[in-house]
A protein has these predicted regions:
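Intrinsically disordered, low-complexity, charge-dense segments enriched in Lys/Arg
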Residues: 137-144, 149-151, 157
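Generic recognition of long tandem-repeat/solenoid scaffolds
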Residues: 11, 16-21, 101-115, 143-149
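Intrinsic-disorder/low-complexity regions
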Residues: 15, 88, 98, 141-142, ...
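Predominantly extracellular/secreted and cell-surface proteins with exposed
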Residues: 32-140
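A detector of low-complexity, intrinsically disordered, Ser/Thr/Gly/Pro/Ala-rich segments
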Residues: 1, 5, 112-113, 118, ...
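N-terminal segment immediately downstream of the Sec signal-peptide cleavage site
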Residues: 1-61, 66, 151-188
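Alpha-helical structural elements
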Residues: 87, 122-124, 147, 162, ...
């Protein structure tokens, strides 16, 4: 991970990114469908824990991953709206390879978990989704991190909670907020 003219990002620096302009984070009920939840405001925060020279693999501690539910909608039949989305079991470990491959893993014995609260005519329901890990891609073209159709399974919730969730989101630009001006971060 570097900033500017190949300056290595320091261990302990805090990285941040929001959704790429004009995009949405989605959790759809199938890999090919468009039924589910969509949010236009989301962000993540991570702290760099290791940053060896390329071709090494950098490590980060993902300490925050938020969704502004004011920008979230759902088109699931029977659902009136989204009252909350929480990413649980933080922090996660994020490994960033010099080729741009990203792997997000939870603590041992845990899971990547998201709790979605949906408003229905019968009240608010809680849907919990889990995945063993997530895989994404970092790109220097726009200093982005993207996740595409990452598969979650429902671990609890009523029948209104779809049984599978496929998460897609693109965050850009990733910046180093520990440095003046928050320069963008490059991989490799």
């Amino acid at each position: 991970l570097t900033t500017g003219e190949n300056t290595p990002v320091a261990v302990g620096d805090v990285l941040n990114a929001s959704l790429a302009a004009g995009t949405a984070a989605t959790l759809y009920s199938s890999a090919t469908g468009t039924s589910g939840v969509s949010c236009t405001s989301s962000a993540f925060t991570a702290t760099v824990t290791a940053n060896p020279a390329a071709p090494g693999t950098a490590s980060e501690s993902l300490t925050g991953h938020t969704f502004d539910t004011g920008g979230c909608t759902s088109n699931v039949v029977g659902v009136l709206g989204v009252s909350g989305i929480t990413v649980d079991n933080l922090p996660y470990t994020t490994a960033v390879s010099s080729d741009g491959t990203i792997t997000v893993t939870p603590a041992a014995g845990s899971a990547v978990q998201t709790t979605v609260r949906l408003r229905t005519l019968l009240g608010t329901i809680t849907c919990v989704y889990q995945a063993p890990a997530l895989t994404g891609t970092a790109s220097n073209a726009d200093n982005s991190i993207a996740f595409t159709k990452q598969h979650f399974t429902r671990s609890s919730g009523t029948s209104l909670c779809f049984s599978d969730g496929y998460f897609t989101a693109k965050y850009a630009p990733v910046t180093d907020t520990s440095l003046p001006g928050g320069p963008v971060v490059h991989v490799g």
